[in-house]
Amino acid sequence: MIRNLTLLSKSSLDPKCLILKHSNKNLNNYFKQITFRYYSKTNPIIKQQNHNNINNYNNTTPETQERINELLKLFPPIKYGFAYGSGVISQKGYNRNGDGSTSTENPSKKEEQSPMIDLIFAVENSTKWHSLNLVNNQSHYSFLGLMGAHIVAKVQYMNAKIYFNTLLEHNGIKFKYGVIEYKDLIDDLKNWKTLYLSGRMQKPIFNLPTSSTEGLKEIQEINSEYNLKNAVITSLLMLPETFTEYDLYHTISKLSYSGDIRMKGAENPMKTHNIVINNIDGFRSLYFPIINDHLTQYLNVILENGDEVNSSLILSQNNNNKNNNKNETTTTAAPKMVTFKSKQDPMNYLNLLMMLPGSIKSTMLKEVRNNMKLMKSDEKIDPTILHNLIFMIVSKSSFAQTVKGVFTAGISKSLNYMKLKLKKNKK
């Protein structure tokens, strides 16, 4: 292999580094990755890609984006990734200053209460990624890191199939990150087997600039075609005939928290409201295209004056507002809400059920058949049945992930993490 390498030049970035070319083009791609990782510590250059997409419409400040970029220099390449949470997306109760920290009534506690940045990395080969990450970031791992990347990956594949390193700090930036195999993320977006990450992606997120173009495009398409559409459909089946725009986004946001054991004391019970109220435009950017492309036959959009309009009109107004305020980092005035009215008839109801993810659809259709046997064919299925199905999926994955966290974070970090969550809940 060595004799097939050709010396091109010395690196201008680091005189100790040589730029090599291999006769095998596939190996050249490998060397590019290694070189990027070598430079990441000393002369970090993150290639900024155009991630101006529906998920990236949020209240993330430029300062927060800089902090995220600072963290990304630490890690090996990923296929897709996103940032989420109160440290990234504006939430009521977390009024961030220019440095991305949280304003509080007690300035002395500002640093303590500053929300951490949450990162998710989707990688093609978890064992290889952890192997690379352990070289420079072994301190991020619990005792499992000492057992090697193979063991770390095995633990990752359990349950929700994500491995978290938490309660970390770099240059004053608090953060945690989760690693999932790319194919497992796609599976959750399509089939809702855990709703662990698909639930987070039902809300505004910040797509990482180190995501590959291919990965970003594919995830966006799958998220829109399956995950976001299913979130709207599920919410329509749970909501009454007439409901507000806020009701829709609130119901969607609650899906991934229904059954989450962290909501029983360790997570802020107003979390869903706090997410929605500061990000109405972000939710509109996510869901009006879905409604316009797939669900107009099931929904009317009613303005405050009672007029019915196509959802695309509201979306265009939202985009104009976004362009007019592109230099603002927070919403200065609450956007006007619209009211939805679902077109409830047996055929529409059945059509919506048929679009749900596989296991949920099977159970709901079974209930329909039972109703037909009882001569209740004109009655809708009790929405609590659908709610309970979502509850079971989320509770199973959240409980398993919490237990797994004791091993991936270590007992001490796990206790500290829960303590921080409880403090956050008391705000």
Curated annotation (Swiss-Prot):
It is found in: Mitochondrion inner membrane. Pfam families: Tam41_Mmp37. GO terms for molecular function: phosphatidate cytidylyltransferase activity. InterPro entries: Tam41. Pathway: Phospholipid metabolism; CDP-diacylglycerol biosynthesis; CDP-diacylglycerol from sn-glycerol 3-phosphate: step 3/3. GO terms for biological process: cardiolipin biosynthetic process; CDP-diacylglycerol biosynthetic process. Its main location: mitochondrion. The keyword Lipid metabolism applies. Its EC number is 2.7.7.41. Disulfide bonds: none annotated. It is an enzyme of class 2 (transferase). It is a peripheral membrane protein. Residues 94-106 have a biased composition (Polar residues). It catalyses: a 1,2-diacyl-sn-glycero-3-phosphate + CTP + H(+) = a CDP-1,2-diacyl-sn-glycerol + diphosphate. Residues 94-113 are annotated as: Disordered. Its cofactor is Mg(2+). GO terms for cellular component: mitochondrial inner membrane; mitochondrial matrix; mitochondrion. Keywords: Lipid biosynthesis, Lipid metabolism, Magnesium, Membrane, Mitochondrion, Mitochondrion inner membrane, Nucleotidyltransferase, Phospholipid biosynthesis, Phospholipid metabolism, Transferase. Belongs to the TAM41 family. Catalyzes the formation of CDP-diacylglycerol (CDP-DAG) from phosphatidic acid (PA) in the mitochondrial inner membrane. Required for the biosynthesis of the dimeric phospholipid cardiolipin, which stabilizes supercomplexes of the mitochondrial respiratory chain in the mitochondrial inner membrane. PANTHER family: PHOSPHATIDATE CYTIDYLYLTRANSFERASE, MITOCHONDRIAL (PTHR13619:SF0). This is Phosphatidate cytidylyltransferase, mitochondrial. It comes from Dictyostelium discoideum.
